[in-house]
Structure formats: C-alpha cells, structure tokens
C-alpha cells in the first residue's frame, strides 16, 4: 500500500480568457510545483493538469513536463502533442503523467511547459497538480 508524502497545486490561470498569450516555438512555463519527497528512494510522482488553447482548426501545440525548474529536453518526463479541433472557442486539454524514476531528494521540482504555432493562444485555465507517494 502506498504512503502519501505531499500534494501541491500551481494555478497560473483559473478562468477562461487568461493569460491570453500567443504560443511560440520555444516552451514557456505555465506551472511549477515542489513536492516534499523526504529523501524517500523511488518515490511515485503523479502529475496532472489542464491547459486551455484557442486557435485555428489544425493548429498544433505541445505540453511537456520537466523534472526541475528550467526547460531541458534531457529532463522531459512527459510530452503530448495536441491539435485545435474547433475555430474560435476555448478548448481544454488535460494530461496525466507519472515519474516512476525520480531520484531520492528532499524536494522534487516539476515544471509544465507549452509551445506551439503562433496562431494559437493560451486562453486558460492553466493548472498543474502533483502528488508524491512511496510504496
């Protein structure tokens, strides 16, 4: 049976219409959390979140989750590509990932990033959650 260690939430935007920023080719952070993992070996980290995107039909975007606070492709633990399916309306895209190979640390930091074509806009909400447990 698993043992609960910590749970954190990062809410960049809780409403539709914000932050209203265009996507670009470089990943931009929309959430960051630090989970207290207490130096436990092999913690089980479960991450999830939602991002709202508006754009032209067929516009693509990428959500990446990184172990750490700075974007580095080496530390990407999750990558998902999405496509805008309707014109003009806000679409909500949710994701769930696990980091089953997190190193023992007092705190494990995770950051969520988004990138995409410039005709797409981050319309919110933008939330990022994490739970740490041990077995």
Predicted regions mapped to residue ranges:
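Terminal beta-strand-rich extracellular "head" domains
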Residues: 50-107, 113-135
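Aromatic- and Gly/Pro-rich donor/ligand-binding loops
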Residues: 47
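Terminal (often C-terminal
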Residues: 1-44, 56, 129-135
């Amino acid at each position: 049976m698993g043992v609960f260690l910590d749970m954190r939430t990062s809410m960049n935007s809780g409403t539709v219409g914000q932050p209203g920023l265009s996507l670009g080719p470089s990943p931009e952070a929309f959430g960051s959390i630090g989970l207290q993992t207490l130096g436990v070996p092999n913690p089980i980290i479960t991450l999830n979140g939602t991002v709202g995107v508006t754009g032209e039909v067929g516009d693509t975007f990428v959500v990446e989750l990184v172990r750490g606070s700075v974007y580095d492709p080496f530390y990407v633990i999750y990558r998902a590509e999405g496509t805008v399916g309707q014109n003009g309306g806000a679409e909500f895209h949710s994701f769930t990932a696990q980091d089953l190979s997190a190193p023992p640390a007092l705190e494990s930091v995770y950051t969520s990033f988004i990138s995409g074509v410039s005709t797409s806009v981050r319309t919110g909400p933008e939330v990022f959650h994490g739970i740490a447990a041990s077995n």
